[in-house]
Amino acid sequence: MNEHRREPHRRSGYQDDSAFTNTEKLVDELDHNVEPEQLLEKNRTDFKLMYVIVKFYRWFNNLSFITRWITIWFPLAGALVIPLAVGVSPYPNAKLGGVRIFWIFVWLEVAWGGFWVSRVIARLLPYILYPLMGILPFTMYKYTVILTALEMPLAIFFCSIVCVCTFSPIMIGKGNFTSTTVTTTTSATATPTASASSNAVESVFVTKTAASVPSWIKVITKILGAAVVTSIVLLLEKIFLHFIGFHYHEVQYQYRITDNKRNTAVLAKLLTAALDAPYHDSPRVRRQDYLLGLIDTRSMSESKGSGNGKLRKVKKISKNAKRIFSKTRNAISTAFTDMLGKHAKDLTPEQEFILETIRSKKKCLALARKIWYSLVPEGEDCFQKEDLIGLIPDDEINDIFHILDNDYSRTVTLDEMEQFTREISIEFRSISSSLRDVDLALGKLDRVGLGVVGIIAVLTFISFLDTSFATILAAFGTTLLSLSFVFSTSAQELMSSIIFLFSKHPFDISDVVIVNNIKYEVVSLSLLFTVFRTMGGSTVQAPNSLLNTLFIENLRRSQPQSETITIVSPFATDFKQLERLRDLLLTFVKENERDFRPIIDLNVSDFSTLDSLKFTVTYYYKSNWQNVSLQCVRRNKFMCALKNAIATTNLPAVADPVRGSPDYPFVIEQYNLERPEYSKTASRPQFSDISSTASSNSLSNKPGFAHSESRNYHTHDEDNSSDDNHKREDRGHLPAQYLRQSVATWQIPNLISAIEAYDSQNESSQENATYTVVESNGNANGDNTATNSQGATDNGQTTTNTTQNNVDNTQATTDNTQANTDNMQVAIDYSQNMDGQIQY
């Protein structure tokens, strides 16, 4: 099969090496029936050197710091002894720059040893100052902790002092730099001799002047002096930086880290108790163990020589190799941690398992279920304090159960256990992310500080080495002054960001905050900006200098919060209905004490317009709104309970009228019975948004029929002769009436009685007018048949009389209509006084 395998086409310049090359080789070896045990043994042989390095590092790291430092100091010190020994015996007069080699390497030994002695002093200084600072207030005593973080800057400062104090005595004091001065003195003595004589005495004075010292010694002396000044500036910068970091961690994370450690310890104790619980071997627990990786089910599901088993073993070999490489890299990268003043603390296997578990959401929930299933038999929904007796020491049961039982129900459900572990996981990841981002911000601030220290160091060295320092300083000051106008805005933004992030620090990673009435979640922190995520998922970046001027509401740091809901009810709502509503809501929150506090505040806020009554319902959560999903579930639960309580109390609603409902406003329609075609085609007014007790503006304008100028009416197809008659008649008739009224239920009887009286009077007047017209026409026809000779004259007279009668009847109908309209206006005024509404 392998011989006939087709090679894939490779283009020019294509590299065959990939990340899966080693895995493909391992799979090919499996195809050739290579046993996984042989591969494992082969990899152990290949990684033997790495195992040795890791083992040596662990052994070396477990030694005391004195032993480690002596081990690091000894190789270089031994190397410096070789030229020192050469300058003692074989070549005692060997010199370097006018100084014997022996004294040069003596000073190098002193400098190298002084560095490690300074390390020891800097390490022991906090332990020495703790008892001495105990007499001071605690606010000063706690700052001695900063000394533990200043070990390296203090060591550099002490070492520079040692170097500058020992260089001149050794190099100049032991060097052969002499200038000989010969002085001759003559003394006269009085003797009883015949001649006077004088004796000349020559005196030789050996002096050492500055001119005789080599120039390189002068230069090194100046360099060491500048190094002392630079070390002082560096120490001050580190003190300032660590003071900011200490204050930040103390204020922001002291209690959070303490609480998280306490909860993690409780979780570890519960896990230990679950291993010895009565139901620790149930199928439910074993499923959670498989998710946690505590058991290996491959032996039950696969044979020894199956391909899947081999592939899993290959993956295991690759994972072990990766772990070995990681350990080797850590060993190499931490080889100089002792020199940098950093120390790692090993964790116990239990702590490592808990910390690894709470980093994963799935494993975190599996751990909670494992503990709960181990303590609770199948069919039960909670466990009590008595279930922990014998598994946890008696003096710790009360504290542990107090932490788990947040609602004081004396039981712990599965939801509470999952919520407990979920909060530990979220808090742990939040603290880790916040500390990481803050450390990065401190690192950036440290780089800025080191840049300033570097500039000061350059100026310091120039001032020590150059005599014309004043000229250089003037030129540098002019340049700095000109650049200040360019970077003034950036410098101001930097200072505002530093104050906002390290002094104010209104939020941390994963906090839910409200800025400008918009809810955000903090994603990351930086020195100059902050990244947020909206509830919709979009990412927002805001400069810290701008956030420094805004009001920020932090939900995570808030205490258990409350929410207020405003409800509008009819003005006729009484006190008993409100108290009934409050009692129902209070019963609901007591039944759901895991979510709400047993408090309900109901307050009437406003009824100034006398058309409605506004009141507020305030309920209290058991926690803040940091967990958005949990807050939404609780709010929906309460809103549904509020809806049911309002329906139970029969509280009337204030809403738009609904046709056909007896409890809500209704619509009345009145048509013109004389011309029904107008009623069918008349355009009706739109349904406006008014309440049942709002006043109608149309009442004050024209109570009665609606205006006809703004509406168009159409008629059916008729003869041309009758169209003109209809048009003439339209001028005397008003359009069809459409009365829309929105009133309360208790106003209906009076209004209906007035409308019925109006309708009955209108119908009777129309019947009388029709009867009169018919009777007049009959009499006219009889007269025409009896008197044929006077047909034209009589017909003309009859027509005149009929027309006059129609005019009289029409006038009577108009008078009746006006009277009915007045009656209708009286009914309307009465209804309006009763707070009704009529709209035309």
Swiss-Prot record:
What InterPro entries has UniProt attached to this entry?
EF_hand_dom (IPR002048), LSM_dom_sf (IPR010920), MS_channel_C (IPR049278), MscS-like_plants/fungi (IPR016688), MscS_beta-dom_sf (IPR023408), MscS_channel_2nd (IPR006685)
One GO CC annotation: endoplasmic reticulum membrane
For the Lumenal compartment, the record's topological domain ranges are: 90-100, 148-151, 247-449
Q: Where is the composition biased (Basic and acidic residues)?
A: 708-730
What does changing D395A do? Viability does not decrease in a calcium-dependent manner
| Domain annotation EF-hand: ranges | 392-427
User: Could you tell me where the Low complexity compositional bias lies?
Assistant: 688-700, 776-819
Q: Its induction, per UniProt?
A: Up-regulated by both hyper- and hypo-osmotic shocks.
Where the protein is mainly located, per its record? endoplasmic reticulum
Task: State which ranges are Cytoplasmic (membrane side).
Answer: 1-68, 122-126, 173-225, 492-840
- Tell me what effect the entry lists for E396A: Viability does not decrease in a calcium-dependent manner
Q: Which PROSITE patterns match?
A: EF_HAND_2
Ordered alphabetically, the record's keywords are: Endoplasmic reticulum, Membrane, Stress response, Transmembrane, Transmembrane helix
Q: What is the reported phenotype of gene knockout? A: Upon hypo-osmotic shock, cells display excessive increase in cell volume compared to wild-type and undergo cell death.
Region annotation (Disordered) maps to 677-730, 775-819
How is it placed in the membrane, per its record?
Multi-pass membrane protein
Residue ranges annotated as transmembrane are 69-89, 101-121, 127-147, 152-172, 226-246, 450-491
The UniProt record lists the keyword tRNA-binding: no
Q: What does this protein do?
A: Regulates intracellular calcium levels and cell volume for survival in response to hypo-osmotic shock. Involved in maintaining vacuole integrity and protecting the nuclear envelope upon hypo-osmotic shock.
Domain writeup: EF-hand domain is involved in the detection of calcium concentration.
> What's the family?
Belongs to the MscS (TC 1.A.23) family.
Q: What is this protein called?
A: Mechanosensitive ion channel protein Msy2
